[in-house]
Structures are given as structure tokens and as C-alpha cells.
Amino acid sequence: ADSYFKNTIFPLLTPMVFDNYHGFPLLMNQLLTFGVVTRTTDEGKPQDRVTFVQIPQNLARFYEINRKDKIIFVPIEEIIRWKIKKLFRNVEIVSVNLFRITRNGDFTLEESDDLEADFVQEIKAKLKTRKKGRVVRLEVERNPSQFMMRILKERWTIDNANVFTINSLLDLRALWQIVNHRQFRDKGFKKPA
């Protein structure tokens, strides 16, 4: 897992700081994101800030470790969490929290006289705004940093009814990577209808 992190994962990770000098970054819809709370000392006073690290969607969700007659699937987020200090040298890490947001993807098309000519342009414009749509759901692992949660709730004006604490793997759809694995194809597993 060390070499996989160093050669494959690490080059794809980009920390995005939010503090007095850096604006709030645009976090992508449905991507797993780490909120890393760090602490520095400024004039003798501790200063906390949050940095976001999104897990690129082109990475496989599980890293496979082959041991004799079995395969161990390690969630990619656990490898990143294990090595997150590599991104934050000489800084105290207070907490590392995984979360995922869902943005509002609804849009309506306006009717016009020349619908055919405008249709493609209007779809392109609407899809661009969709990336910046309002956050309507926040899924977070248990025991998140209250400092980070306060920032996220204020930034997205999201109430507790739309914040979901997940006590297991975030985004269970990722389990299809295991179900569809070549070792299990002929074992009699059936996808639900």
C-alpha cells in the first residue's frame, strides 16, 4: 500500500485550504472529501483551519491485497487517512473527517421561438451551473470535527435535517467493485433485479 500511495494516489491529491487568506473552494458533487482540521500557532494563539482533500473519482475505490488464497479489499480513503500527514508537513493535524455532498442538480429549460438553435446552448449553460448547485445533503462519518461542521453548515446554509451521519462506508455503490471482481464472477452471486 505504501508504493501505491506514493506512486498512484499522492500525485492526484490536492489540498485546498480555507482560511482568512484563501476562499472557500468549490467542492465537487458526490466526491468523497476529507476535511482536515489543522492547528498552527500565531503570536502564541492556536489557530485552527480546515483544508479539503477530494478523492479523485478515477481512483478505484478499493485497493486489493492478495494473501495466499484470499483477497483483502482496503477502502482507498483508509489508505489516504493513514498517509494524510504526507500532505501536511510541519503542521499539527487535529482531526481528519470524511464527508460527501450532494448538490441540487435540477434545472428547467425555458421555451423560446427558436428552440432547436438554443437547445444545445441552454443545456450546456445549465450543466455548467449544475456543478455549482446548492448543497442539499451532507453525509459525514461519525464523530466529525465540530469546527469543520460549523464551517460547512454556515457556508452551505444546510440544516441538521439534511446532515446524515453514516456509521459505515460512505457511498455503498462502491461495493459493486468487489461484487464484480473477477474472483467472484462465477460464484453464483446474482445482482438484484
Give residue spans per PLM region.
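N-terminal localization/anchoring segments of enzymes in phospholipid and broader phosphate metabolism
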Residues: 1-193
